[in-house]
Amino acid sequence: MLFRSQRRAALVAMQQLREFEPRLVGPVLSGTATQHSEVQLHLFADCAESVALKLIDHGIAHEVTERRVRMSPERVLAYPGLRFAIDDQAIDVTVFPMDGIRQAPVSPVDGRPMRRANTVEVEALLEGEPAPFSEDT
């Protein structure tokens, strides 16, 4: 179950970074992910360094990046980002300012505000998914 393992990795990352109000976005949330899709998270912090320090506290190696995000049809902004892995699953984080939680970027698919799921919503998605088939039963 591809989505299940990707969403579980997302949930682990979201729980470890809970103080930054994480939101799952993109193909893993929408159900269109492939085995090569990264888990995409939006975090909210005064500075990206605080997120990096939290990853260091958890012993998670990471890479600092920058992400260009379309906030409206005519406005593209650059935000700091981080890349790391949880259980061999690539995680791509974009760090927005604290007030960024109120305005989602526009979706590259349909131009509407991007759907975001908080930890509770991701847990509910996982509960609604069938368990992987086990040959032991």
For each of these PLM feature ranges, what is it?
Residues A10-L55:
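Active-site nucleotide-donor binding segment shared across nucleotidyl transfer reactions
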Residues P27-V28, R83, G100, A124:
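Residue-level preference for alpha-helix termini and adjacent loops
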Residues E49-R67:
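Hydrophobic-cavity lipid-handling domains and compact docking modules
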Residues E49-V51, D92, I101-Q103:
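Residue-level signal for secondary-structure boundary sites
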Residues A61-M98:
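Conserved catalytic core of two-metal-ion nucleotidyltransferases
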Residues V95-T137:
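Catalytic cores of NTP-dependent nucleotidyl/adenyl transfer enzymes across multiple folds
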